[in-house]
Every structure is written in C-alpha cells, then in structure tokens.
C-alpha cells in the first residue's frame, strides 16, 4: 500500500476474511503481541488499521519465504 493513501479501518469480518483466521485465533494472537490490536472507535465498536493488517500479512509471508510444504 502506498503511504500517500489514507488508512482505512476494517471490521472484524473483513480482517478474518483477509487473514484466514477466526475470531478466537485473532484475539489470541493479539494477547500474545503477534497481531495488531484494534482501535476502539466507539465504546461498542473496534476496527483494525488496513495498513497494519497488510503489514502483518507481509511479515507472515516473509517468515515463510523459502519454506515449502512437504507432503
């Protein structure tokens, strides 16, 4: 993502779709400091930074680069 573009906020369903993880796993990773925490935009609503989620995806892909699955 270009740094000149404004950041968007994502709902949990969009975050789950993008990263392929469920709600429980996302919140477990947040507690472990391994996934970006959401921002409280209202007392009842949390949203994730699109840029932070994209950066996490890139970090995960970089961590597995060169490692192929064996069957």
Please annotate each region the language model reported.
Residues 1-25, 32, 51-52, 58-62:
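Polyanion-binding surface elements
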Residues 32-39:
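Short, solvent-exposed alpha-helical "recognition" segments
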Residues 34, 47-48:
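Short secondary-structure boundary/hinge segments and terminal tails
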Residues 39-45:
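Short Lys/Arg-enriched helix C-cap and helix-to-coil transition segments
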Residues 64-71:
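Short, charged recognition helix plus adjacent turn
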